[in-house]
């Protein structure tokens, strides 16, 4: 067996494959958001603000 570090090993070696997977994932996931683009946009904003937790000082 070839040595791979963790689950993302294949993507680390093949960025194009990772990019494809990201695109496909984005298209197929979030079924609820397809019907409500505004809700998806709000969720994206909230997610961006809250990730990283301590940076905003609001926890």
UniProtKB/Swiss-Prot annotation:
Q: Which InterPro entries match?
A: Stress-induced_KGG_rpt
Q: Region (Disordered) spans which residues?
A: 1-59
Amino acid composition bias (Basic and acidic residues), ranges on this chain: 1-23, 36-45
What GO biological process terms does the UniProt entry carry, in alphabetical order? bacterial-type flagellum-dependent swarming motility
| Bias kind Gly residues: ranges | 46-59
Family under the similarity heading = Belongs to the con-10 family.
The identity of this protein, by name, is Uncharacterized protein YciG
Q: Which organism is it from?
A: Escherichia coli (strain K12)
Lineage of the organism? Bacteria, Pseudomonadati, Pseudomonadota, Gammaproteobacteria, Enterobacterales
What gene name is given for the protein in this entry?
Answer: yciG
